């Protein structure tokens, strides 16, 4: 089973569990063995709670015995990893920073409560760029996560630990958070599916904030249908998050390709786009046209302002959100013998951040 985990989807797990092909306990033990075997190379996890995972698996097996398949919770027995900026009661939550190295979450984030209600099994907490600020997971204060497809490459970030854990066959799926690409970019780098939900559709209560007006929690999975299943489980209004709202239900299970309209923004195919990327996107457009999908050229003239706006909003909100940690603990000293050396090291960090 350990070799199967890399290719097991959420739907396959639920089917096999309900058919008694294997138990939730067996599945979790296989995940834990894979983590022990692969972590020395991948470094996707910051903490793993074997005892909690096995307890949850036993509960899942009991429910599977007692309930019919149609009455089982939506994510029954599915092992999931959680980005380490989302609070899970009793587990460490570091946000990839030594400032929070010994912080233990005193309560569950709303998404964790909802995952538990849906029957998911929490395996552990995944690595991230410090306070979710980064795009490579090289900026974690603890370790550098590798891309399981190519160990010489980064997994993306800041949810790189979650993406690597799923793509590397350590867990079936994971939660990440996104402000400016932190779910979708690592999902792309690792060859899996990432969804940043519409702002307000998923509660941020229990998420260590980066930029509050942009942050969202979302799934990283192997299939689109798996992402949909997790999104269905975690979405909804929350009295603890005033930005959440009720969105209209889309009860239609599937759409005919002929019913779909896809916009092609002309501004996205400028000379700045990598030729290989543009070529692949154009191939997809051709394939969709062959399937009778309606392709419509649109204009998004304000797109060019998106990045400058992001770099005004995100640092401003981050400085306010992270001010609460100021003075909690002294930072790690740089290795420098003189003040000039210290200035040099500091300037290297600043230049690297700007680039």
Where are these regions (language model features)?
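An N-terminal boundary/leader segment
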Residues: 1-52, 290-292
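Acyltransferase
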Residues: 24, 28-29, 58-61, 273-299, ...
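Residue-level signal for inorganic ion chemistry
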Residues: 31, 53, 108, 227, ...
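Acidic/His- and Gly-rich active-site-bordering loop/insert found
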Residues: 53-55, 70-142
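Short, basic, low-complexity termini and linkers enriched in Ser/Thr/Gly/Pro
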Residues: 59-74, 250-258, 350
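Short helix-loop capping/hinge segments that flank enzyme active sites or metal/cofactor-binding pockets
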Residues: 75-95, 256-265, 316-355
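Short glycine/serine-rich loop segments
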Residues: 108-234
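A short helix-breaking turn/cap at a secondary-structure junction
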Residues: 196-279, 284, 340-346
